[in-house]
UniProtKB/Swiss-Prot annotation:
Gene Ontology CC terms: cytosol
Highest taxon of the lineage: Bacteria
EC number: 4.3.2.1
GO molecular function: argininosuccinate lyase activity
Keywords of the record: Amino-acid biosynthesis, Arginine biosynthesis, Cytoplasm, Lyase
Protein name: Argininosuccinate lyase
Keyword Cell division: no
Reactions that this protein is recorded to catalyse: 2-(N(omega)-L-arginino)succinate = fumarate + L-arginine
Length: 440
């Protein structure tokens, strides 16, 4: 049974049926579809479009279908065109002809737009919760490992920071991601139900009522836009892509830091894998997969942008292709956030190796230049002097703080005994606004 067909003389080909069906993926929307139908039916009786006893039968049937699906009794499968057909046909089979009144004053166009918005809202809230979990782990692990480490530019050791402060940089990225998602929730918080196919309905339906019942701020202002708007999907996948970019950057650093060349951290066994041939290997596959899956979410974004780029108003069947990219992007970003939270919460930090890398990198060179500036030298001249000292140290395989005062005075008479206290790594990180890094 189909929800259409009266104007056709010939049967749809089996090839076209399979090609046209979206049930295999839009079955994810069963809860939202039934929830939207329940709100629609309650509105119909309020507006005297159907009778009270008809409403009761339909609601009982819909609630029964939902319970059977959740309980595994009713499987979402078969030759149905989509989840809407599945629910409606099963409703009619369950309660009889009164089930045919469910679709009064509604089109599948506004129905699917509603389903996707409800699902998008729920999905976004899930992603926000995962972000919060990861951010909590970053703060906790950072506070437990507030050790001095090299900060990098161009992947070259630059200045002293702390492991905690480095993790907090990612906390800030994810905090922005959370704000972006909350803003997206506000923008999409308008109900398309009642837009009909594209031009509303001749029935005196109450869109304000269903919008409120379904948790939306208001109904959409324009019917045409209501059924054809997929901006919120594009926006959310775009925001998911930014989250994945942040996760990928963090993954890259964790992969580097856990390598034998760095040995800054050790990723827990629970988030590592081994080699089928090399017994000694412990690979950071969790972080590598997150890095790899970033491109997958970018692909989902390009997919939906391409689907929508040339569509005339209003609804077009092309829009059926909005679901799989969104489902995939949402599932991917949630799994990656959860895995990253696990990686962060179980990693071990090698305090000694962090400090060894600090000592090898002339990370107090800028502070040494600041010292000369404080003694009256122009910064550009101080920059040149310290650069010459670095060359001298490299030739001697020494650090600036290991040079004698006599050696330092070969480069400038401004050096005094207090230079050593000034360029001490722990002291320097607590000078000026560096105190904001919170080393303690």
């Amino acid at each position: 049974m189909k929800l259409w067909g009266g104007r056709f003389k010939e049967e749809e080909s089996k090839l076209m049926e399979d090609f046209n069906s979206s049930l295999s993926f839009d079955k994810k929307l069963y809860y939202e579809d039934i929830k939207g139908s329940i709100a629609h039916v309650k509105m119909l009786v309020n507006q005297d479009i159907i009778k009270e006893e008809e409403k009761e039968k339909i609601l009982l049937g819909l609630e029964g279908i939902l319970k059977e699906i959740d309980g595994g009794i009713l499987k979402i499968e078969g030759d149905y065109e989509d989840i809407h057909s599945f629910v409606e046909i099963n409703l009619i089979n369950k309660i009889g002809d009164v089930g045919k009144k469910l679709h009064t004053g509604r089109s599948r166009n506004d129905q699917v737009a509603l389903d996707m918005k409800l699902y998008a809202k729920k999905s976004t809230e899930e992603v926000i919760e995962c972000l919060k979990g990861l951010m909590d782990s970053l703060i906790k692990v950072g506070n437990e490992n507030n050790y001095i480490m090299p900060g990098y530019t161009h992947l070259q050791r630059a200045q002293v920071v702390t492991f905690r402060y480095h993790l907090l940089a990612y906390f800030e990225m994810f905090k922005r991601d959370e704000k972006r998602l909350k803003n997206a929730l506000e923008i999409l918080n308008e109900s398309p139900l009642g837009s009909g196919a594209l031009a509303g309905s001749t029935y005196n339906i109450d869109r304000e009522y269903t919008a409120k019942l379904l948790g939306f701020r208001k109904p959409v202002d324009n019917f045409l836009d209501g059924v054809s708007d997929r901006d919120y999907i594009i926006e959310l996948i775009s925001k998911f892509s930014i989250i994945m970019m942040h996760l990928s950057r963090l993954s890259e650093e964790l992969i580097l830091w856990s390598s034998s060349e760095f040995r800054f951290i050790q990723i827990g066994d629970a988030y590592s894998t081994g080699s089928s041939i090399m017994p000694q290997k412990k690979n950071p596959d969790g972080a590598e997969l997150i890095r790899g899956k970033t491109g997958r979410v970018y692909g989902d974004l390009i997919s939906i942008l391409t689907v929508m780029k040339s569509l005339p108003l209003a609804y077009n069947k092309d829009m059926q292709e909005d679901k799989e990219p969104f489902f995939d992007a949402k599932d991917t970003v949630i799994s990656c956030l959860k895995v990253m939270e696990g990686i962060i919460s179980t990693l071990k930090v090698n305090k000694e190796n962090l400090m060894k890398s600090v000592k090898k990198g002339f990370l107090n060179a800028t502070e040494a230049a600041d010292y000369l500036v404080n003694k009256g030298m122009a910064f550009r001249d101080a920059h040149k002097v310290i650069g010459e000292i670095v060359i001298y140290c490299e030739d001697k395989n020494s650090a600036i703080e290991d040079l004698s005062l006599e050696e330092l005075k070969q480069f400038s008479d401004l050096f005094c005994e207090d230079i050593y206290e000034f360029i001490d790594y722990k002291n320097s990180i607590n000078k000026g606004i560096k105190k904001e890094m919170g080393y303690f």
